[in-house]
Amino acid sequence: KDKNSKIIIGDKSAVLFQDELLRVKKNKSKEIKISTNTKVVILVVFKPSHLKNISSSNITKIKNIYNVKKPWGYEKWLTGSTNKNYAFKKIFLKKGSKTSLQYHIKKIETNFLFSGNAKLHYMFKKIPLKKKNFLKISKSIKTKIIKNGSVINVNPKTIHRLEAISDLMLFEVSSPHLSDVIRVSDVTNRPDGKIKNEH
């Protein structure tokens, strides 16, 4: 920290509050130091090769996080709505709610369950993925209780759904295919893809 208690980042400083984010541009920073007098949780998303030749002049504070309303809670797109390299989301689900039973054609995602308990509905079995096969699909769905600290990797064509046993907070890192959502079943009958009135 400097004498005014601002966090020093090389030759730059920034004060971060809850839900704020710093972005480090590819191949620019060597070291990030954080000083705090309260407990904080820091999530870092990067490709290993991006840690070479980093300079502090390419660290920026994200001011406008993209917010998306959902019937089950909300998403905060921490990397914005136009990042072509990857997506990083903070996701909140209300207790008792559930996401669509869905799969993706291209999108690959990893979810970190930060707080709360959930029931994961999933299926790896290869069944022709069409909505008219829902009865066949539903008989093959497995469930598993997951708790905070769990990590879920979802590959393309894996049917999945999260059901919130308690309020849930999770972080998702994925490929940038954010409209690639095929909804096999949805409580509110939402169609496939991006829902305009949520944005």
Task: Name every feature range the model reports, one short phrase each.
Residues K6-S29, F124-K157:
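Short acidic-glycine-tyrosine-enriched beta hairpin
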Residues Q102-E109, L113-A118, Y122, N133, ...:
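Catalytic cores of nucleotide-enabled group-transfer and carboxylate-activating enzymes in metabolic
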Residues K1-S5, I91-K94, Y103-K126, V173:
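Short, conserved beta-strand element in jelly-roll/cupin
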Residues K157, P176-L178, G193-E198:
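Beta-strand/loop edge motif enriched in small/polar residues
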Residues H160-I182:
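A contiguous, mid-protein "functional segment" used to position or interact
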Residues D2, K25-N27, S35-N37, K94, ...:
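A short, compositionally biased micro-patch
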Residues A14-Q18, K26-K89, K94, K98-S100, ...:
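A short, N-terminal "cap"/entry segment at the start of jelly-roll beta-barrel domains
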Residues N4-K6, V41, K98, N117-K119, ...:
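Structural motif
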